[in-house]
Amino acid sequence: MNKLFLATAIILLSGCGPGLVIDKAIGQYNYAESRVELGDSKSQVLAILSPSQATLSSKQKKRSDKYMKDDVLVEIYYFRTGRQPDGLTTDDEFTPYVFNNGKLVAVGWASIGGPKTQGQTQDSITVNNSTVVY
């Protein structure tokens, strides 16, 4: 009986783990992001926001972009700020921070043309104070 209980608990908890890690990172980001302002240096912004993403696995993150444009070094860092219940990691679950020559010049997808990938939202209804996803 104990083995059955333990196996069931492991199965149930292992499915929740990644979502809880992501949700914690999002909460930490939400707490820290108000301290960031346009014009801040890249090192200042990363010192404030990177700790919020530290517990995420590489599959739960989005790699930064770096390129030169008109003699300006453009770097875009993406921070996890959302999660869809579809299990996919898509662009719309991140907020981009754009740096030109090491200074923060823009925050958000509007500055770089919008996300390339988007998650699948699930419709839901509420019945007797319980959310039903379908």
Regions found by a protein language model. Name each.
Residues N2-A7:
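Sec-dependent signal peptide recognition
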Residues L12-G15:
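C-terminal motif of bacterial Sec signal peptides marking the signal peptidase cleavage site
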Residues G17-Y134:
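Residues within mature, well-folded domains
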